[in-house]
Amino acid sequence: MAAKDVKFGNDARVKMLRGVNVLADAVKVTLGPKGRNVVLDKSFGAPTITKDGVSVAREIELEDKFENMGAQMVKEVASKANDAAGDGTTTATVLAQAIITEGLKAVAAGMNPMDLKRGIDKAVIAAVEELKALSVPCSDSKAIAQVGTISANSDETVGKMIAEAMDKVGKEGVITVEEGTGLQDELDVVEGMQFDRGYLSPYFINKPETGAVELESPFILLADKKISNIREMLPVLEAVAKAGKPLVIVAEDVEGEALATLVVNTMRGIVKVAAVKAPGFGDRRKAMLQDIATLTGGTVISEEIGLELEKATLEDLGQAKRVVINKDTTTIIDGTGEEAAIQGRVAQIRQQVEEATSDYDREKLQERVAKLAGGVAVIKVGAATEVEMKEKKARVEDALAATRAAVEEGVVAGGGVALVRVAAKLASLTAQNEDQNVGIKVALRAMEAPLRQIVSNAGEEPSVVANTVKAGEGNYGYNAATEEYGNMIDFGILDPTKVTRSALQYAASVAGLMITTECMVTDLPKSDAPDLGAAGGMGGMGGMGGMM
């Protein structure tokens, strides 16, 4: 086992604070409308330019191991804030640095670290309740666009595009961000349910100009099995032909004789048919087939529940207004399923989202909710160069996360004003003893830090602006972009409550642990092994020769 280097008390805390400051100082230059960019060197390819706090934090590793421990703990604050709300990483880092700096001063002055932590925790719990009281719902497109604009560093086009996407696919719809091919940003919206499976034979195509199969008011047969024998399907095909409607078959696979017969029937015009593979694999395929059944009002023909294809009737088939199938995707538009059944299915999947343990499972379940409840929108980010593309895509993703958080928990006045108002309201808060009261004051003083940093990045004097804002009330604050005072809500400067709340909670959590640190242990650097060069060995041999 490697030997360890151990530091105690003030020595440990000074080293830790130095690491905290290196990381936080690099991250906080990005805060606010006049925040600057940070350039990150990459081992290959062009450097990355970013204004995303967590991207900067992730790149920082320090040579001194004690300082690095401090930096890594603050990095955890940024990562946690990013995971919880998708934004607010820079605010969280600024808050953490402020609490740690003030807290360690109090420890150095002889305060009890555990009581300080209890005071900080008490202040944060009270502050979270105050934030919830200040929060107003964010439901209209204008407010959503404003939140997106602020989070995308005052880029109005991004805010408007996100608001438009939410309008089209609903609050529950999936909105994804991709790299575009042109210079302009584009918004693609897919209404209805789309899954990544295309036609099984190009002979089904009835729109040669688009290379797609388009069927109006089709029946939809859902089968959780491979279909290779056409005899199994004859009763359904005959019933559909009599009804004079097209048929879409979604099955595990359609192959051999069955596929050939369907192609021949389609080409002769006896019955319009198209076959696609069911989406997903294993249990996920069963679940997605059930989703399609709920959406279209059909039944999944599965031998597991005692249903056979030969005995299927028109009542077992789903229906939709339109189905479009191309080489890679199938889109079902306006399924005829009952609204109550669809909502029930959505609620069931949401419950699974709550219980999911892996991010991958959670993402797939949320996609299923979106496909049932709304639709899918894709924002394609346009830029002139690869470097600009990456920077812009990161901003759009942040803005999207912020707008989702705003819809979820509402918004408060932005620009650091909400935390200043909360701190003012809690000025009379007290705890069990004087050391805990100092902890409360540490947390309340730290709540001014985001406002001060925004002002500092804008090139103004933080103390002057902070005192002017504190003298006002309600949503009165400082617009760093235009350098004027006024109502932040009227300026359209809004922060999602969830983002501000998460930033404060995670910052206080890690800062409290760091203030109560008394000892730090790390591996000693390995010294290079002594060089047993050839010359030494030869010298020995020479000596032996002399003895002879």
Swiss-Prot record:
It holds the Pfam family Cpn60_TCP1. Keywords: ATP-binding, Chaperone, Cytoplasm, Isomerase, Nucleotide-binding. GO terms for biological process: protein refolding. It comes from the Bacteria. Coiled coil: none annotated. ATP binds at residues 30-33, 51, 87-91, 415, 479-481, 495. GO terms for molecular function: ATP binding; ATP-dependent protein folding chaperone; isomerase activity; unfolded protein binding. It is an enzyme of class 5 (isomerase). Forms a cylinder of 14 subunits composed of two heptameric rings stacked back-to-back. Interacts with the co-chaperonin GroES. Belongs to the chaperonin (HSP60) family. This is Chaperonin GroEL. It comes from Pectobacterium carotovorum subsp. carotovorum (strain PC1). The gene is groEL.
